Structures are given as structure tokens and as C-alpha cells.
Amino acid sequence: MPQISFEVVAECPHTRARAGVLHTAHGDIETPVFMPVGTQATVKGLTQRDLAEDLGVKILLSNTYHLYLRPGHELIRQMGGLHKFMSWPNAILTDSGGFQVFSLSGLRKIHEHGVVFQSHLNGDTHKFTPESTVDVQLAYGSDILMVLDECPEYPVSHEYARESMQRTVRWAREANEHFLERMKQMPTRHALFPIVQGSMFTDLRRECATALVDLDTDGYAIGGLSVGEPRPLSLEVVEATEAILPRTKPRYAMGVGMPAELPEYVARGIDMMDCVLPSRNARNGYLFTSEGRVIIKHARYKDDEGPLDPRCACYTCKSYSRAYLRHLFQSGEILFSVLATRHNIQRYLDIMREIRHAIISGSFPDYLRCVQSSLHDAG
């Protein structure tokens, strides 16, 4: 019995785009879906009520590495799991921690059966293995767990990318075997997604995807994106990879993207995406609107009485002027981050809802052509 189920409700005959529903133990998720990032079990500046009730977020992403170091997976287990710990009623996807560990560079060492790393908090030594990261994420009670993978930097040689990809495949097999054994004793439902790697080499991506499909997991992720590569290359890699992944399973593009990129990935068969940009850029005064990007510190907004985005129905846009938002930002007020983050996440969610509606109504190609021009400033 699958740990989650996925059904496709509409497909675009002219692209690879599809609309679906992902069924999890913590509710149904309409796809394509954008997942806000709650690294430390919180989306900075927003409460869980803001996210679930006001914005309608159905799934969040949290970070295995950061929560493992603080407060620790055993404490989270003792507190009843991550859902109860952070008072979140809907689904949670946790990454494996691999991206963060491999970003540590001099603070980690790769072995065939895992990676040893030093905590960026206090220098303590830790080890992640394919099996241990599964156990950590099960302690969290995550609905969707990610397999430990190696995310190489960009660019790397074809030789190293192949070695890294083969290691990722071995880790995926080990993690999946352990996960299936753990599921025999678990009363709750969880799903495991392996991650396709291979840097920007399409032959390696295809080889990796083919090997991972043999595991017959509940879904598949495409990692190693947004690591400095040109956007056309990223889209090319996704297109080559997606062609091998089963149409009956959800596909997740990790760490993407800007507003103008979202429909491009959906057009290539992607169902799930996440990115820190809407919240991080919000805190830095970069706001996404239906008319393009607004850099709120610019002087032209000093006496602008209009809403941030006239087409947006979020609380920020219904209640405050651009002039007031600029005042908050220039004054360093915490309220700015709250209002800006709320708006940016709303904008991303609105884009995904527009995409889904376009797929179901049969107008996605027209939507894609329109959005490529209207959102180019935001991308």
C-alpha cells in the first residue's frame, strides 16, 4: 500500500504540465504546489495560523539538518513530532540535510556510507548516513522524507559528477531498504522521495533517474538546481530527467525558483517546488507583484498612496500603502518583514493557483506565453 497517493486530474496536451491531488496523512494537496520554507520549523515572520488559515498553505518544508542540530530530533519526538511541536495541522516535507551538509565545504568529509560533518553552531562532530537521516525524519513525523544525497557544486567535471551520482544512487537504495523495514512497524503513513543528481550533465541525470525509478518509491525529486547554473541549463536538465520519471508519481524540483520560473518548471512536468526567495527577498525589501518586482526602498514610493499590488487580495495589499511599507522598511521595523513576507508568499501561491486553473481549463499554453512577458521583470 502506498504511503501517499497521487492522482492526475488534468493534463496539458501541448506541454508536460498537469494538475493533480497529492493525498497525505495530513490532508490533500492540490498540485502544482509551491511549498514555503520553514527552515527552523517556522516561516520567518509568520505564524502557523497566518500560513494555514489566512494563506491556505497545505504543505511546508522544514530542514532536517538545522532541526537535528537544534533542538534535536529526540526532543521533537518527545514533544509528539514536528506537527505538534510547531502546531502545524497540514503536511510537512523535510529535506535530508544533504544540501546543507555539503555546503559546509571544509567542515565535512564524504564517506561511501555517509558524511561526517562539524556543526556550524559549536563545532561538534556528527555523521549522517542514508539510514540515520530516515530515522531522524521519522522522529519528526514528516509526511514526506527525502533521501540523503550528494549535491555537487557547479561546475564540476563529468568524472566527479558521475562518481557523486553513483554514490547518491547507492545511498537511495540503502535508505529505501531501511525505510521499508521501518514502515512495517510504523502505525503512521510516510513517504520517501529519492533525489536525482548528476550535475548539469543530461546523460548522468538520465542514468540516475533510471536507477531511482527501479526503487518504485512514492515520488521523485530533482536536486542540484539553483546552484549557480544558467536558468536555460537548469530547465534542460529538468526536461531530460522528467521524461524518465513515471507519470503516476509526483515530481519535485528542489530549490526553485523566481516567479517567472514557476510556470516554466510546471510546463516540464514538475508538480512540487520550494524556495526561500519569497520570504528572504521580502525581508530585504524585494517584493513580487503581478506587475513585476518592487524594490520598496526606492524614493518613488515615499509618497505612493497605492497598494503594493492592486490585484492582490492579501492583508498587506488590502490594508497598507506603498508609502507606509517603505516607511517601515526604512525604519527597520519588524512589522515590515511580517507584511512583506505575507505578501510575497501570497503572490507565489496565487501564481500556482493561476497555473492550476489554466491547466484544468485548457488555457495553459496561452497562460505560459502571457506570463513569460508579464513576469520577466520579477524573474
UniProtKB/Swiss-Prot annotation:
InterPro entries: ArchSynthase1/Queuine_TRR, TGT, TGT-like_sf, tRNA_ribo_trans-like. Binds 1 zinc ion per subunit. Gene3D superfamilies: Queuine tRNA-ribosyltransferase-like (3.20.20.105). Substrate binds at D95, S96, G97, G98, F99, D149, Q197, G224. Keywords: Glycosyltransferase, Metal-binding, Queuosine biosynthesis, Transferase, tRNA processing, Zinc. Belongs to the queuine tRNA-ribosyltransferase family. Catalyzes the base-exchange of a guanine (G) residue with the queuine precursor 7-aminomethyl-7-deazaguanine (PreQ1) at position 34 (anticodon wobble position) in tRNAs with GU(N) anticodons (tRNA-Asp, -Asn, -His and -Tyr). Catalysis occurs through a double-displacement mechanism. The nucleophile active site attacks the C1' of nucleotide 34 to detach the guanine base from the RNA, forming a covalent enzyme-RNA intermediate. The proton acceptor active site deprotonates the incoming PreQ1, allowing a nucleophilic attack on the C1' of the ribose to form the product. This is Queuine tRNA-ribosyltransferase. The lineage of its organism: Bacteria, Pseudomonadati, Acidobacteriota, Terriglobia, Bryobacterales.
